[in-house]
């Protein structure tokens, strides 16, 4: 409080604020905030002080028992008093409705009647106290673990034992780790009193040193954990008199690795037994420990070492050395000391303004190294661009905003515990402006230098202060689209430039600059948008990477500086990985070499190096592999066994040490053997490293020998196996025949076991290598057990009570098994009191090892059952033919998938010849293999079997759904997506749903199917300036997956210049009139509502509008005059020809022939590019044919089916067989198909011969028929039987005079509206309504029976001239690969062979038009050509020009009306 009062007095001093103003620009961004106590505010502003808010008491880890009560303490201090809540496992507890949990007045949590069972553990877990002050913030306490002791379970029972007087003895009692504190011992059913000679180790084990007669008796272990006591087996400890002979020195209990926390006590157990009685000494890291003079080190009974108040210096390797004068043995263990997290520097309270950068400091220590996380007002702080963890543990907040205010806590956690420390952040308001003048906005703010990670800004002084020597400046900047703004101040007054550092490459930033004077901050400059450059300056690979082994556990790696460093190399990152694993580790290095320690011995590692400069990581070097040096083996050979061959030899068998413990190439084995009697000489024999057995000969008859084996590498000898004994025969016995029957067999049944005893065969001259015991209910062949030849009794365990068992006993040797001896017994009922069979206590048992190696399972098969289940079956050749398992063998099944790569195997054990593998992934290939294990021996893995699970419907929607507008086409959008992350099979298709109402039923959405190999789709003809919602659903062979979340997209606004060409190109016809096509350069006036991006635009000036109207009128008058002059110059001869042709009734093909010189005017289409050409009569008898392809669009060519309605339904919501580069569709086409027409033309504009015809009125509907079925649209050329050139026709119809049947058999088209112009020859029309379109065909085409494709013409702009066809878009024609071009005859060829006619439907203004077929007939014979040439003499009606001019006048009036509107 004194510091606060001093801060207030300081803040009220004007000189202080002048000094702060001068230093404002000198502050670094991260240090621009005031630390606890001083608030950097201007005079007059209210000062907020920091509020004390902290925990007085925090909960700690607690151990409880079932049924008891427990209190977790918690108390917090604040003014006003905080509200206390509790979290369990991260979730708030509802204490209002909880009967067993209640909140105490001080904030502690009281839990009554703790519940804990095997399947219900509601009280055990992690608890956290949360304190909240409504107007201040929230803090959370450390996390405390509540452990509830489980039900007492003995993992190890005490066993009967005997001890010589004066020696040491132990009795095991292993229970659950959490129940060890509740263990006690009883002797003869009375509590055992512990003293310096009789102690209980922390594990619960009882140690009796210097045993006396009084120590003998019955012992049992008792666990009392709140419920009824749990008793272990009661066993007898016998104290035998001192035999005064020498016995082996052995460890009864060896130390094991331990982990303790600083401040705890630890006991390193070590108990040895032998005669003479051994003494125990301890060493730490090869230094002897003085347990007599040290107060913290105590030698307990039996030799165990107790260390009190453990410190970090106590960590290390401890050696227990037992010595009895004749022999010395030692054991070692590692003690690891851990430390709870502790704060070296705690975060402090901070004052700051908005847009400033601050740093909360937090420095912790602990072992293992703690992890640090930050919490703001009780919520986790997730690192981002503006919340960063710097210098390992500090929290940096960039660009403060008001919502950042509150309490921040640094929480440190490791395996031992956790701790928290917090601080408060207060965001201060800027001081109000004084009455003095403030500076205006700085001028000409520009980015003078733009780099990848920094931008330099410069500006001019404000206009209000041209000199600006006393002005300071603040630059505010933020990422585009981010509301959080940061500030950078100039370093001294008058400086007009600043460099913004630590920016992201290729990122857009928004900058603004404000000037400050002594009165306050002025106006802000206009925002400046600048994009940083992309990152390209990264280091190259480090050359000359080398690695060499420095020791068995370390490797040194060296390298050089990259040639292309692109700047100063800041550091290197060295990556290394053990061969055969997928876990790569890394270490930061500042030099050009590094030695990695703690590696595995004789193991291969790979290394690579990546250089870092200020831009980031560079290119990695190639991997370099090296192996650590070899060392002596760290483990003994495995599976040592002895086989007595005769009276003078014994065969030894063994297996190499485990691969991980060989530590190098095994170069040999050292065999040591001696007689079992004490003080006998040891003999050594060396064998090669590939040899796994050795025959030891020259032994004494009837003598017991001890054997042990050790492995060797070039570095030395590893540890040896334990001594194993075998006795040679008294004499060389016969092994040419099987042993005889054992002389006797006795059985003694118990409740769940049978004790079997026997005597050897009477004939002692035949070798007996062991006995085989068979037993089973009703049959002795169910189970078989083999025992050593010296064994005379055996206890068969795990039998059923009250069951009849048949038992057989056979002696065997290497020749085979002898004659069996049978016996039967009935186990006792379960109600009988179990008794200990004293006959078998301490009975030696030496099982005979199976001499044959284990064979792997065969015939492994994988049967697919479902999408996540596969059954694995196999056979075992080591079993009998009926494949019945009669021993304790088991099988291990392993499986994995190769997707993703380097996945690890999963394993499961089975006791049958099959296993059901569940929980697999759908549509995934797995490989399986099986291994058999019997005792300590295992086979190799079997051959692998493979199986792929069935598919399943996708369980996740398509991801990354994005919608963008297509450039240049505002009505077209492009939908992109990525496949589902859980496709569960091959994706066969997608369905896109879109609608303008996100809440509409899904069946009301428009759907767009897409094939499965596409990840993008175009949708056309959407409404402008309209929000659409899109969802995507994936499907595979099993069905549809879930839909993605709705993605909203608003189509852009477009002006009329954009709309006109788009509508025209897509053929979208609307009802009502349209604006005429005034050319691509014409742009009508736009209102503010039609401006792009929705921004209002200023309306056109009225004078400009008047000028446009007058100009259009003048141009129109000029065009009309030109057309009138052109038309009046037609010759009289041409008019006569028209009249004659109109009155002629010789031909049945009635159409308007195009005169050679007549060129009907076209007001909106450039007829210089494409005109109606007449047909010239050429006398050339050998015309030259040209093959001209017709450009087509697959969207506009639709095969004609039986009816037009069926065509429309086929196109609706279905896949298209042939799609263009981008899949396209229209919304209008989904609501109702708009008629489409396509008018293909020759790629050479002057070539096509086109005739335009009127559409019949509604009163006289005409029908177009096809005489045969349609051909496939994929056919490129159809050949006339009698013609040498390919022809491309839409259909073949005979002359109407020759065939009228074709007219009656064709399907009808849609009714045509009345044409705006009528033909002059109406009196010659077919009364039955035959079509007026021109058809040309030959009789040979009818006979051929070929069916040809029909193309539909898409209507062009409704105000285009009826006399001139639509001009295809400029540029080279595009061809659909599915619909190849059909050749047309050239103009010259047509003059001699055929009068080829294309028909186009011409409708009136504003009316919708159905599709009409475009007919390109084939070439007729010569005689047909002659007749057609005669028909071509047709000419116009005398009044035809008048009608055309009248029609043209109507169009002019429409244009004038639109222009003036």
Swiss-Prot record:
Keyword rRNA-binding included in the entry's annotation: no
GO (cellular component) term, any one: plasma membrane protein complex
Protein name: Neogenin
Residues the record lists as Phosphothreonine modifications: 1198, 1404
Gene source species: Homo sapiens
Family (UniProt): Belongs to the immunoglobulin superfamily. DCC family.
Gene name of the encoded protein: NEO1
Parts of the chain that traverse the membrane: 1106-1126
Tissue spec. comment: Widely expressed and also in cancer cell lines.
Miscellaneous note of the record: Knockdown of NEO1 in C2C12 cells results in the enhancement of the BMP-2-induced processes of osteoblastic differentiation and phosphorylation of Smad1, Smad5, and Smad8. Conversely, overexpression suppresses these processes.
UniProt note: domains: The Fibronectin repeats 5 and 6 mediate interaction with RGM family molecules.
Gene3D superfamilies in the record: Immunoglobulins (2.60.40.10)
Pfam family, one: Ig_2
């Amino acid at each position: 409080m004194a510091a606060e009062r001093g801060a207030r007095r300081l803040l009220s001093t004007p000189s202080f604020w002048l000094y702060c103003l001068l230093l404002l620009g000198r502050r670094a961004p991260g240090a621009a905030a005031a630390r606890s106590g001083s608030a950097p505010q201007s005079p007059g502003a209210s000062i907020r002080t920091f509020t004390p808010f902290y925990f007085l008491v925090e909960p700690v880890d607690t151990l409880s028992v079932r049924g008891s009560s427990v209190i977790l303490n918690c108390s917090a201090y604040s003014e006003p008093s905080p509200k206390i809540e509790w979290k369990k496992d991260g979730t708030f507890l509802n204490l209002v409705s909880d009967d067993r949990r209640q909140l105490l007045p001080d904030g502690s949590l009281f839990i009554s009647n703790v519940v804990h069972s095997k399947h219900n553990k509601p009280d055990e877990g992690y608890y956290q106290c949360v304190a909240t002050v409504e107007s201040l913030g929230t803090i959370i306490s450390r996390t405390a673990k509540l452990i509830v002791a489980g039900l007492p379970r003995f993992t190890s029972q005490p066993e009967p034992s005997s001890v010589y007087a004066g020696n040491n003895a132990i009795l095991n009692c292993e229970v659950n780790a959490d129940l060890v504190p509740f263990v006690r011992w009883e002797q003869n059913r009375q509590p055992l009193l512990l003293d310096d000679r009789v102690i209980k180790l922390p594990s619960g084990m009882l140690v009796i040193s210097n045993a006396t007669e009084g120590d003998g008796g019955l012992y049992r272990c008792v666990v009392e954990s709140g419920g009824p006591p749990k008793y272990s087996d009661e066993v007898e400890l016998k104290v035998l008199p001192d035999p005064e002979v020498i016995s082996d020195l052995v460890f009864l209990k060896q130390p094991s690795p331990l982990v303790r926390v600083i401040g705890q006590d630890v006991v390193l157990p070590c108990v040895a037994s032998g005669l003479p009685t051994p003494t125990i000494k301890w060493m730490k890291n090869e230094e002897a420990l003085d347990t007599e003079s040290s107060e913290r080190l105590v030698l307990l009974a039996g030799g165990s070492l107790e260390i009190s108040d453990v410190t970090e210096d106590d960590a290390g390797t401890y050696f227990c050395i037992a010595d009895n004068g004749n022999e010395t043995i030692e054991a070692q263990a590692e003690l690891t000391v851990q430390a709870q997290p502790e704060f070296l520097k705690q975060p402090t309270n901070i004052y700051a303004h908005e847009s400033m950068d601050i740093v909360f400091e937090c420095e912790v220590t602990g072992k293992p190294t703690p992890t640090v996380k930050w919490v703001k007002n009780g919520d986790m702080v997730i690192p981002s661009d503006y919340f960063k963890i710097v210098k390992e543990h500090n929290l940096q907040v960039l660009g403060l905003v008001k919502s950042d205010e509150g309490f921040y806590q640094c929480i440190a956690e490791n395996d031992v515990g956790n701790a928290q420390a917090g601080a408060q952040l207060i965001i201060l308001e800027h001081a109000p402006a004084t009455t003095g003048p403030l500076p205006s906005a700085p001028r000409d703010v520009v980015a003078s230098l733009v780099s990848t990670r920094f931008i330099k800004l410069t500006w001019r002084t404000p206009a209000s202060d041209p000199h600006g020597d006393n002005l300071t400046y603040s630059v505010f900047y933020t990422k585009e689209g981010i509301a959080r703004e940061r500030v950078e101040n100039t370093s001294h007054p008058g400086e007009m430039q600043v460099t913004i550092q630590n920016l992201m490459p290729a990122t857009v930033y928004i900058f603004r600059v404000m000037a400050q004077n002594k009165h306050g901050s002025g106006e802000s400059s206009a925002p400046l948008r600048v994009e940083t450059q992309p990152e390209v300056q990264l280091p190259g690979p480090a050359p000359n990477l080398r690695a060499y082994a420095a020791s068995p556990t370390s490797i040194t790696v060296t390298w050089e500086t990259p040639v292309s460093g692109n700047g100063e190399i800041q550091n290197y990152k060295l990556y290394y990985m053990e061969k055969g694993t997928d876990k790569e580790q890394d270490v930061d290095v500042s030099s050009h070499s590094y030695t990695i320690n703690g590696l595995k011995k004789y193991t291969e590692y790979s290394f690579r190096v990546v250089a870092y400069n200020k831009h980031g990581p560079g290119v990695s070097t190639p991997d370099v592999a090296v192996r650590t040096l070899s060392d002596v083996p760290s483990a003994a050979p495995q599976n040592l066994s002895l086989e007595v061959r005769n009276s003078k030899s014994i065969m030894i068998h063994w297996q190499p040490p485990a691969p991980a413990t060989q530590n190098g190439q095994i170069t040999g084995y050292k065999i040591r053997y001696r007689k079992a009697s004490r003080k006998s000489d040891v003999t050594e024999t060396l064998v090669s490293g590939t040899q796994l057995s050795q025959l030891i000969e020259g032994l004494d008859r009837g003598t017991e020998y001890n054997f042990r084996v050790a492995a060797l590498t070039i570095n030395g000898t590893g540890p040896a196996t334990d001594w194993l004994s075998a006795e040679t025969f008294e004499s060389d016995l016969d092994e040419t025949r099987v042993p005889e029957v054992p002389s006797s067999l006795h059985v003694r049944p118990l409740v769940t076991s049978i004790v079997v005893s026997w005597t050897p065969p009477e004939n002692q001259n035949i070798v007996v290598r062991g006995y085989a015991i068979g037993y089973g209910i009703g049959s002795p062949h169910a189970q078989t057990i083999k025992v050593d030849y010296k064994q005379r009794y055996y206890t068969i365990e795990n039998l059923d009570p009250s069951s009849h068992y048949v038992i057989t006993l056979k002696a065997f040797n290497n020749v085979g098994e002898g004659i069996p001896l049978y016996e039967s017994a009935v186990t006792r009922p379960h109600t009988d009191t179990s008794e200990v069979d004293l006959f078998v206590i301490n009975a030696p048992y030496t099982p005979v090892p199976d001499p044959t190696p284990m064979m792997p399972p065969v015939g492994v098969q994988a049967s697919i059952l479902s999408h996540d289940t596969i059954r694995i079956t196999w056979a075992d050749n080591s079993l009998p033919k009926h494949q019945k398992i009669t021993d304790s063998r088991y099988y291990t099944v392993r499986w994995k998938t190769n997707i993703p790569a380097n996945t690890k195997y999963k394993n499961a054990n089975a006791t049958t010849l099959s296993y059901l593998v569940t929980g697999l992934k759908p549509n995934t290939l797995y490989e399986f293999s099986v291994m058999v294990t019997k005792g300590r021996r295992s086979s190799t893995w079997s051959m692998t079997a493979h199986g792929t699970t069935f598919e399943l419907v996708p369980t996740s929607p398509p991801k990354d759904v994005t919608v963008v507008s297509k450039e240049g086409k505002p009505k077209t959008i492009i939908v992109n997506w990525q496949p589902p992350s859980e496709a569960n099979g091959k994706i066969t298709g997608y369905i896109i749903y879109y609608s303008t109402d996100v809440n509409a039923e899904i069946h009301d959405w428009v759907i767009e199917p897409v094939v499965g190999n596409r990840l993008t789709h175009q949708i056309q003809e959407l409404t402008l300036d309209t929000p659409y919602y899109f969802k995507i659903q994936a499907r595979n062979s099993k069905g549809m997956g879930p839909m993605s979340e709705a993605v909203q997209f608003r189509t852009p606004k477009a002006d009329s210049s954009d709309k006109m060409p788009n509508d025209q190109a897509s053929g979208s016809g609307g009802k009502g009139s349209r604006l005429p096509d005034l050319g691509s350069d014409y742009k009508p006036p736009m209102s503010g509502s039609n401006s792009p991006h929705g921004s209002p635009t200023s309306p056109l000036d009225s004078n400009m509008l008047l000028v446009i109207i007058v100009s259009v009128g003048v141009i129109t008058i000029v065009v009309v005059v030109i057309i009138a002059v052109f038309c009046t110059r037609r010759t009289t001869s041409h008019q006569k020809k028209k009249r004659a042709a109109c009155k002629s009734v010789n031909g049945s093909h009635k159409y308007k022939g195009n005169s050679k010189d007549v060129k009907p005017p076209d007001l909106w289409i450039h007829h210089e590019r494409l005109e109606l050409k007449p047909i010239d009569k050429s006398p050339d008898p050998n015309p030259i044919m040209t093959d001209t392809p017709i450009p087509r669009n697959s969207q506009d060519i639709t095969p004609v089916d039986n009816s037009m309605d069926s065509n429309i339904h086929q196109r609706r919501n279905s896949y298209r067989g042939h799609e263009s580069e981008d899949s396209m569709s229209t919304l209008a086409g989904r609501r109702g198909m708009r008629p489409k027409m396509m008018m293909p033309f020759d790629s050479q504009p002057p070539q096509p011969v086109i005739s335009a015809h009127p559409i019949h009125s509604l009163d006289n509907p005409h029908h177009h028929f096809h005489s045969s079925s349609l051909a496939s649209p994929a056919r490129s050329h159809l050949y006339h039987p009698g013609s040498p050139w390919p022809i491309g026709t839409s259909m073949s119809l005979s002359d109407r005079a020759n065939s009228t049947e074709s007219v009656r058999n064709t399907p009808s088209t849609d009714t045509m509206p009345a044409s705006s112009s009528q033909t002059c020859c109406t009196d010659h029309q077919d009364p039955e309504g035959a079509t007026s379109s021109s058809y040309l065909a030959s009789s040979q085409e009818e006979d051929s029976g070929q069916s040809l494709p029909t193309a539909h013409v898409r209507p062009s702009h409704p105000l285009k001239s009826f006399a001139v066809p639509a001009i295809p878009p400029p540029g080279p024609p595009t061809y659909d690969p599915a619909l190849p071009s059909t050749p047309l005859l050239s103009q010259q060829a047509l003059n001699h062979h055929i009068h080829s006619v294309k028909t186009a439907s011409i409708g009136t203004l504003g009316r919708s038009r159905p599709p009409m077929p475009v007919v390109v007939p084939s070439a007729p014979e010569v005689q047909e050509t002659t007749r057609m040439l005669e028909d071509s003499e047709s000419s116009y009606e005398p009044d035809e020009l008048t009608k055309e001019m009248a029609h043209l006048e109507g169009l002019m009036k429409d244009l004038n009306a639109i222009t003036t509107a």
